């Protein structure tokens, strides 16, 4: 029962739509009705930038940080209280699932990139550093957020087999692949636009 409560909390906290809330509170804008209609930092930047470019950058950065922390903090708290990595990895997956399929938004949500990066940073810090470098380079060259995110995810998966061929305690890369699958699934419209060379440049 205790584990079920922890899992539920990880999901519900991960489901908090910080991007949507920040845009509504500070920019008086409903990002669910504009841009890509996603609740993530990229859409916050895209939509709010039309009326207030400076505020857009601030809110986008805040969204990234909060979306990452909502996955990280529950895991760190559970780790502090002695829960093992099997439970912590399950919490990580549920946090990303909550962000992407939020019960507060009729099970819609964001793309899971910031939350996924946050939870994976707890377990795979070196891999996340490599992924962030890839995200920065791809974003700088192509200026397409979705392409940078997908490229970074590929780098993370590849480097996870280099730095952690056997994931400690759980001895499987399954949670990483589940998180990656969720992120790719939420990026399907972006992937189709990338193939059709219609994806918008943002970063």
From Swiss-Prot:
Describe its membrane topology: Multi-pass membrane protein
State its location(s): Cell inner membrane
What's a BP term from Gene Ontology annotated to this protein? phospholipid biosynthetic process
The record's function comment reads: Catalyzes the transfer of an acyl group from acyl-phosphate (acyl-PO(4)) to glycerol-3-phosphate (G3P) to form lysophosphatidic acid (LPA). This enzyme utilizes acyl-phosphate as fatty acyl donor, but not acyl-CoA or acyl-ACP.
- GO CC aspect terms: plasma membrane
Q: SMART domains under this entry?
A: G3P_acyltransf
Transmembrane ranges, per UniProt, are: 5-25, 58-78, 87-107, 118-138, 150-170, 176-196
Per the record, the similarity remark reads: Belongs to the PlsY family.
Q: Which reaction equations make up its catalytic activity?
A: an acyl phosphate + sn-glycerol 3-phosphate = a 1-acyl-sn-glycero-3-phosphate + phosphate
Pathway(s) annotated for this protein in UniProt: Lipid metabolism; phospholipid metabolism
Q: What class of enzyme is it?
A: transferase
What are this entry's molecular-function GO terms? acyl-phosphate glycerol-3-phosphate acyltransferase activity
* Keyword Transferase assigned: yes
Q: Which keywords, in A-to-Z order, does the entry hold?
A: Cell inner membrane, Cell membrane, Lipid biosynthesis, Lipid metabolism, Membrane, Phospholipid biosynthesis, Phospholipid metabolism, Transferase, Transmembrane, Transmembrane helix
EC numbers on record? 2.3.1.275
Q: What is this protein called?
A: Glycerol-3-phosphate acyltransferase
The domain of life is Bacteria
Its gene is plsY
Subunit structure, as described in the record: Probably interacts with PlsX.
Kindly give the HAMAP family that the UniProt entry links to this protein.
Answer: PlsY (MF_01043)
Q: Which InterPro entries match?
A: G3P_acylTferase_PlsY (IPR003811)
**UniProt cross-references to Pfam families, sorted A to Z:** G3P_acyltransf (PF02660)
């Amino acid at each position: 029962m205790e584990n079920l409560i922890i899992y539920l909390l990880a999901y519900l906290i991960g489901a908090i739509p910080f991007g949507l809330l920040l845009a509504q509170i500070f920019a008086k804008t409903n990002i669910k009705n504009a841009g890509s209609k996603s609740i993530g930092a990229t859409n916050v930047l895209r939509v709010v930038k039309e009326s207030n470019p400076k505020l857009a950058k601030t809110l986008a950065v805040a969204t990234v940080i909060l979306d990452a922390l909502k996955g990280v903090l529950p895991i760190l708290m559970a780790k502090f209280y002695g829960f093992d990595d099997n439970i912590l990895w399950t919490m990580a997956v549920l946090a990303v699932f909550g962000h992407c399929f939020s019960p507060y938004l009729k099970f819609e949500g964001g793309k899971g990139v910031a939350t996924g990066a946050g939870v994976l940073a707890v377990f795979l810090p070196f891999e996340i550093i490599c992924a962030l470098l890839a995200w920065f380079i791809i974003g700088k060259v192509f200026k397409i957020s979705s392409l940078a995110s997908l490229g970074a995810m590929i780098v993370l998966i590849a480097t996870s087999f280099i730095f952690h061929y056997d994931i400690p305690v759980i001895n499987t890369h399954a949670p990483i692949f589940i998180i990656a699958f969720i992120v790719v699934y939420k990026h399907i419209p972006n992937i189709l636009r990338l193939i059709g060379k219609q994806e918008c440049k943002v970063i």
